[in-house]
Amino acid sequence: VGLEVRSVSLRGSFNNWAELPMQKQDNGTWSVSVELEPGVVQYKFFINGQWPKNMCDDPTFGTPQVDAEAQGCVDDGYGGFNAFREIQPQASQPPQDAAVELDFTHDPTAVRFVSVAAGRLSVRFEAKAGTVKEAFLEAGERYPMHLQLSYGELEVWRVAVSPSLGEYRIRVRDSSGREHSFGPFSPPQRPFAALDWVGRQVGYQIFLERFWNGDPSNDEKALATDEYNFNQAWNKDPGAPKPFLSRWSDPPAGDHCCHQYYGGDLAGFLQKLPYLQEQGVSLVYFNPLFDSGSAHGYDTHDYLQVSPKFGDKALLRKALDEAHKRGIRVLFDFVPNHTGLGFFAFQDVLKRGPASPYWNWYFIKKWPFVPGDATAYEAWGGFGSLPKLNTGNPGVRRYLIEVSKYWLRFGFDGIRVDVVNELIDAHGFFAQWRRELKALKPEAYLVAEIWQRDPSWLQGDEFDSLMNYAIGRDVVLRYARGGALFSGSRMLAELARVYATYAEAVAAMGFNLIGSHDTARILTDLGGGGLRDTPSAEALGRVRLAAAVLYALPGVPVFFQGDECGFGGEKPSSPPYDLHRYPVQWERCKPELQAHFKQLALLRKELPALTSPVLRTYKGEASVMAFLRGEAGEGEVLAVFNNSTDPARLELPPGAWRDALEARTYRGELELPSLGWRYLVRMGSAQR
């Protein structure tokens, strides 16, 4: 970027963000060596006494990426983004000296090596790339294992067998012809198993207040329940703006994020259900529906009541029933880390102080206090409207678990949980939460808001999936942007790294998204401009490419309302905030883009391989990237993508491949157009 770099230090979560000076090398780069414990590490470079705002895209210190070796970026909580890397444990050493060169790693108690998906037991091992010629799982019978994933210096080999598998060995013939035997191993008695229904779904996120106003008669109720009525640090200020109502197409005002209401409601959702079904949607994730003090709903006033601005319980039950009749399952958004000011326990603490039985539900620093004063109690993000709950308190835990059970009994099919890593004793709480919820409703789908790749939440005892920004934003979005820094080969390696880290059961249930209510819109991220801009044909093409990649991955593709319409929307750092949440202007939808999303959903129904839990890397060259979906053999799908505006070619695997969209068969080579993609279906058996 032409900047004269005078000093660089490394600061991160591994050293409590203390300074670790880096040294300038002869080639002009800066480096430092540090020994780290296994796990996910967040960090930034401190350059010339300044922090880069975004380690993945900073015009001052390096664009598109300050550290080209970073595996992705995650929100730093201050309007910027930290880079992160996952530090892998050292590979276990096999007992035989001759096998050391393999770096063979397999542990049947680790879910990434053994889990159940699609009714089969997946058994995998890792080895150094290029060292394994063939491998077999032996358990009375001999089952060939096949190369599944390749990235960096590692490979993953895999086989799927009956879940009734008993004791087994893994035999490997290395590249020199030597044979090695590992084991015996015993699979876990109750391996982590995927919910079979999840991976067949097509997801859609609904921010209800901005989805559609089906009943204007309830609009005024938003003002009656708004935070303003409880926040004395706000409502005692005569010059402060008040919450207000807007017409559906009114421009965003300064408090667009939170207290400008447009009237979206459950009646509007019911009116749009036929549209969702036509688009192929079969899973809806609602942002918070319960009584709260804002448009976003993350400041809960009553966990057991529907927000009056949306409707009531009777209307919610009708909405769930009608969705289920159309084959659409529904998740609700749960906020256990903090409440709003109107929550009964907080109001009791406000009035009674230490005498309140709920005093220890919060972290009160002084009393009496003014509600809304963030210096008086711990609050999420320092916002006085969001007092933090003490989830280490047994009473708080019991309340939150019973709330979750109540809504599952009511008819919801699963739960998305907000900021799970910020709870007190989070892992302990969610282990108990999962046990009780799965005992009540074993098929409930449990999703955690974690932005980076972090398998610690996905060991079979807490969550079924994370919100996979680590796939959607850190991999798919960066590939869809194009450019040499995120080539097809890098895209494929990053995908392989993710799927090697996670159990196959986790891959099968992946909640895969690129954008949401917390990010800029996909079109904006791909160069399509902001809320009122007219996007270029290239930007729309990149959206189509990103969607085609996401729909081809294991798990559930999830898009934010209106993404299929081709809407832009920024996430600015100054008012008006959260333009990506502007109401969906349905009359401005782009029919050709809606047709694209509908087509992708139809292909997932028509091609069983696209809903398989299995992804196998094939090839990445320059702008082209290709992976295989499903078990090898007739019907497997080769998904091929080109992120360049120039045409590109790819050598195909042996055999005949039928284009899923066109009546055409390919052999030998495929030419892809600008920003093109293809799903090719194998005709006949695979040739190994």
Give each language-model segment a name:
Residues 506-535:
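Active-site clefts of carbohydrate-active enzymes
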Residues 77-130, 193-196, 205-207:
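Non-catalytic, glycine-rich low-complexity segments
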Residues 668-688:
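C-terminal beta-strand-rich structural cap/linker in extracellular carbohydrate-active enzymes
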Residues 201, 208-283, 288-410, 428, ...:
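Substrate-binding/active-site clefts of carbohydrate-active enzymes
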Residues 119-124, 602, 617-653:
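Carbohydrate-binding surface patches
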Residues 317-332, 337-355, 402-405, 413-510, ...:
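Active-site-proximal helices and loops of the catalytic beta/alpha 8
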Residues 1-40, 48-88, 129-164, 173-183:
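Aromatic-rich carbohydrate-binding modules that target alpha-glucans
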